[in-house]
Amino acid sequence: MRSDKKIDSQGKPVDDDEILIRLLCSPLQYDKETKQVSIDAFDLRMMGKNHDNLEHFASLGRKVAIEDEDEFQEYLQKGYSIWNDKEWEENEYYGYGTFRCKDALATNDMVEIHPLTGAAQHIGMYYAKNEDEYYKGPLPKENLEVFEMLSDLADLINDTVVVAPARS
């Protein structure tokens, strides 16, 4: 059985019709010129100074847990803490795409969405590697099934992307 210490097994399951948010905070994730979401938008990252911390899940926002427009704008600004200053000098925007939980789950059997411990506004999108474990970043895009899954997830939000100017 797959498990992750951040999954809140006691938390309320995510409703099939719940609207989820994926922040798009980098040209690696969304091309403003072509208006295309990249497959990297749902990939798992390597983080840390030496890229030794591998992401276990893609963090998604829960629209239902964001109470008003001010809180929503504050949530959108979280993308700035994801990328370091050097990368932000090249960014001109932040953006996000929305989708229903059940639509993401329908893209591939590997996709699982779970509530996270201590995180009301966030949930985790996990990718099942086998019956015992989840993938850790980055995903093996040379695997056709993984590539198609990421492509389907990108297509899922492509028509819902909202782009706003970066903070000044």
Regions found by a protein language model. Give the residues of each.
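Compositionally biased, intrinsically disordered low-complexity segments
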Residues: Q10, L24, D40-F42, G79, ...
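Active-site or metal-binding loop neighborhoods of secreted/extracellular toxin and effector enzymes
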Residues: D103-S168
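Weak global preference for isoleucine
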Residues: I7, I19-I21, I39, I66, ...
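Intrinsic-disorder/low-complexity loop/linker signature
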Residues: G11, T34-K35, K86, G118, ...
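Terminal low-complexity, poorly structured segments
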Residues: S3, D16, D40, F72, ...
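ADP-ribosyltransferase catalytic core
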Residues: M47-M125
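Short linear sequence motifs
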Residues: P13-D16, L23, K35, D68, ...
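ADP-ribose/NAD+-binding catalytic cleft of ART/PARP-like enzymes
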Residues: M1-A58
